[in-house]
Amino acid sequence: MAGTDPRNRELSLMDKQISSLLEICLNSNLYSINLHCNQISKIEGLRHLCYLQHLDLSSNLITKIEGLDSLASLQSLNLSCNKLTRVEGLEKLFNLKKLNLSYNSIQDLTGLIPLHGWNHKLSHLYLHSNCINSIDEVLQSTVGLNCLLHLTLEQNAKGNPVCHALGYREIILENLPQLNSLDGLDRSGDPVTAHEVDSMDLANLDFLEYLITFDSGRKEVKESLTGPVKTARIDEVLTKYRKHRDSSEAINLNTDGTSSSEHDVVRFQDNSNMLREMRIKKLEDQISELLVKASCPKSEQTKLKAKRDTDITTESDSESTKENRKGSTTKRTPGCHKTSQTSKQQANQQLKGRTSYSELKQNVSRKQSLSKRKTDIETSLSSGRTDTDSTGQILGKPHAIGGSLKKKGELVRNSIEESTYRALVQELDQERERRWKAEQVVLKLTENIKELQSQAKEEKGINSMAVYTTDRIKELLLKEKNAKSKLQELIHHLREENEKLMDELKKLKCKEEDYQKAYKSMEDTLAKLETQNIQKQALEMKQVQETERKVSASQREIDLLRVALRQQKEKVNQLHEVLTSKEQLHRKELESRVALNGPEFQYALAQEMAKEEHHHSQQIHSFQEKINLLTQQYADLEDEFRAALIIEAERFKEVKDGFDNVASELAEHKETVHRCRQKEKQSATLMQELTTMVKEQKARIAEITKAKQEIISDLKSKIHSLEKVAEEGRQKTVQTELLKKEKSKLISQLTAQESLIDGLKAERKIWGQELTQQGVSLAQDRGRLEAKIEVLSNEIESLKKQNERDADALRIKTKIVDDQTETIRKLKEGLQERDERIRKLREENIELEKVLQEQSDERTAQLEELKQKLERQTERKEEVKQLLEEKEAELEDVKKAYSAMNKKWQDKAELLSHLETQVRQMKENFDAKENKLIEERDKSLQCQKVITEKLRSVDDAFRRQLESVLSAHQAELIKLASDKQKEIEAANERVYQVEEEMRHLLKETANSKKIMEEKIKRLTGALSDIQKEF
């Protein structure tokens, strides 16, 4: 169990307000434990975790390192952010590779001395932010750590008092040749990568591969800025469990599109600042020397200068004079031009670096001082700029001739000095311009940094949400893993119990064989005793014959025999009493004992057998019903999966049909493209976003169970953007409404799929509950079987006791026979002695034969009585033999019963093996069905991938067709527009011609009207004249 399933051996209880390790039920098969940010004050209850490799107890209240002696497999130990004052209790951690004791109050490192040598494997040691004072103690405790590669006593400006000692780094690197890096820097001073130093930080996070780094947002930020931005990755932050992170992120911006590390930038800035300061000092020295030189000849002129000449020139005047005289200064001062070029290069390099707030203050102060110096220099220059006319007016007429000669010499000198001053002032102006540009760049950079920090905070919030979701998903997976592990433990426990029962059966069989061997040995001893008894009877007959022959030998021998007979009579009486008492006891026992062949015992056995058979048949029937139910449920699940696949295929077809409908609608609306080009562009962007949404949703359907909340957040953001675009599109076109309807359909499909997934999860939970019920029923059956086993074991013990009693009776009988044999031996010895005595007394007996003949009759009668007694004893022996035969018959009956019990046990063992085979078959069938389902799921995923690829290809082809159609349509529109313009022009010309014709016609009609009116007037006049004449 310990090595089969390593995924079920992780425990994460971060920030659960745990105050003691004894509150947690820790499985002995755990691989890693994370108890970060709790209230644990003592390390205890970890002795049984022999497989533990990663232990995180950071951010707790631990004051002493203890209770870790039994963790032989521990590889990484994190005790940072606790209340430790010394290192101890690490002697038996032979496999420890990484030890983090940072952010404590450690002063004593002597606990690292037992880790010296090649037996321990400590390679990473973190001791930053502690109270270590002496280098000697550090060297003493770390010299013998032969595997130590990375030692950190200072990190992120949080170190120990030792780090401030002179030559601290050189001393430690000289005395510890095994070190590769000290405080995150290798022996050459280069920073060590996080992969080399923190290669073991990802011990218990299994689900970080499902977290998405937000690169798209960063790309937008990079495009908005002048250069790329580097931020700390989310995965590296998660590996450090979000503790003791640096508040400042490494953000490097470049104006030319290239970025460098912060370390190089800081060095370069220091070098450039030093060069600038040296250059400014040289310029100040040159200006001071020139001022000192110019002070002597100018002291006379300053008295005679007018106030209007001593006014300070403005920046615009100085700049104009600089521009007018730039050519002369460049010719005279090539060195200054070189310095200006170098200063430009330095300014460009300065723009590549990152400036801090303190540097900005220094630059501002320097600029103020330079501006003051510049104004002083300009005042001096303006004071030196005097015209010949003004000087002539001030000096007056009497000194005009002598002063003119002096002025010429002074003007020559002043021109040289002014040229040098102007060059220096130009350099200062250039420096000022560069500083001003740098300030503007710094302001832009600070604004960009603020924006990036706000974005980083938002990303941190999103990452925290992602971590929370991963924690919840991990907890759910751990619960499922624990449930699976519990079921496996139950199965393993049942197997162990079955093995124990099999072992007990084997032991019982061995005991049976031992009993059979003992029974055979008893039979052999009984046969030997019977042969010995037969031999003894033959010897007794011989002795009786010898006694009959020798009775007439001597009366003394008869007296002795009488005494012996009396003694034997007493012994026989005692034996008779003992035998009668034992016979009575044995009869009582037989009366109280139930006969194995009796009807009552057989009736009880038959009832119990019938009950057990009925119960066994019921169990088999219940198991078959459960199997049928499980098969039906599995078939129902398969049908549901198939129905879900069919529904998904139908929905995919519906989406495709909707997509085709949209394409047809777009083809229908091509006629109105010339009126709403901008609207079509917006709709095209919306279509692209919707197609990307569809692709993302289809690609993430398989990953919904792992990253559901992330997908929902993305969907919400995209839905908000789509809603904004849709609000604009509602006012402009009807097409956006159709797209919104399709979007709502897609959302409803997603909700339906989520409901299906929830239903599948509920069915999975029901399935787990049914499995638990089956486990409970199996446990109940196991309890019943254990009760039956206990009853049968009690019966076996009673039978054993009966066997022991029978064996005791047999032992008693054998002891009686042994006593009889001892008496016979004693008689034999006495007879031998008597034979010797008889031999001695034969002579005496011959003399007394005559006297004893009369007494011989009486003695013969006594001998007859003795013979009768011997016959009775023989009859008693025969009765004892019959009893032995009966006991043998009883033993045979016991053997038969024992064989029947063995058969029953074998039948039960066969039943158990049959049940085991059925359980294995069920498990194999279940595993096969699971594999089939997994294969079907993989096939469906592959089909989905193929379909998505086809959709993408179709989408690309459709886009190409759309682009080609749009281009053709645009060309046609252009042609139509040109044709229509031509037609409009022709129509306008025709209209103009028609208007002219109409105007001409109107003029002609007007003329004709006038002519007609004149004719009518003439006619009326003529008619009136005719009437007058008549």
UniProtKB/Swiss-Prot annotation:
Residues 160-200 form the LRRCT domain. GO terms for cellular component: centriole; centrosome; cytoplasm. Residues 432-645 form a coiled coil. It is found in: Cytoplasm, Cytoskeleton, Microtubule organizing center, Centrosome, Centriole. Residues 300-311 have a biased composition (Basic and acidic residues). Residues 298-401 are annotated as: Disordered. GO terms for biological process: cell division. PANTHER family: LEUCINE-RICH REPEAT AND COILED-COIL DOMAIN-CONTAINING PROTEIN 1, NISCHARIN RELATED. Belongs to the LRRCC1 family. This is Leucine-rich repeat and coiled-coil domain-containing protein 1. The gene is lrrcc1.
